[in-house]
Amino acid sequence: MRSITTFDLQYAHRFYGFCGEAQYLHGHTGTLTIEVEDSINAGVNMVFPCNEIQKTAWDVLKNFDHALILREDDPILPAIRQVYSQQGILNGAPHNEMKGEAFCTELARAYPECRLVVTKETMTVEGMIKIVYDLLRDKLNIARITFTSGVNAATEEFDVEESMRRCPMCGIALDENGVCPKCGWRDNRTTGLGEPAV
């Protein structure tokens, strides 16, 4: 079964090297849908709490909200950094409070302080799906991601090979030590009983 959560993201980008209107800097409101698949966790009677999917995903997705997303070889990128530096906002501003976790992967790098994401490839709906899956695949059992932006849409299905160990008290994934990061419940494999962490 699947738990499904959606996010709205406002961002600006352009298709560097593209022949058409998208070569100009422009903005979108995109809708990202993440479907998490697993068995129903008997303790909480759900696959995965949607509010916990939102918290887990939003930690990295907020880097894309109200952000400028440019390809790493886009010649406008140095000019943007220069203007941000002249404005004194390259390293952050007092009112930039919605910063996500910085990340650097093969596909993209986030600069949360200045609301900038630099990508390896042009930021299309397909590209966004690749980046999001890469960032979240170890945190959630993602079965499908759909991203719509303007009149563009793409979706991709992913194989979910094994069940994720989850807390029977609140339904979220256990950490590498078998402890729930939210309530402290511990998976005690030796006795088969769960108990609060000490």
Residue ranges and their predicted role:
Residues 1-164:
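Charge-rich, low-complexity N-terminal segments
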Residues 176-179, 190-193:
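Short Cys/His-rich "knuckle" micro-motifs
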Residues 187:
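Extracellular calcium-associated, cysteine-rich motifs in secreted modular proteins
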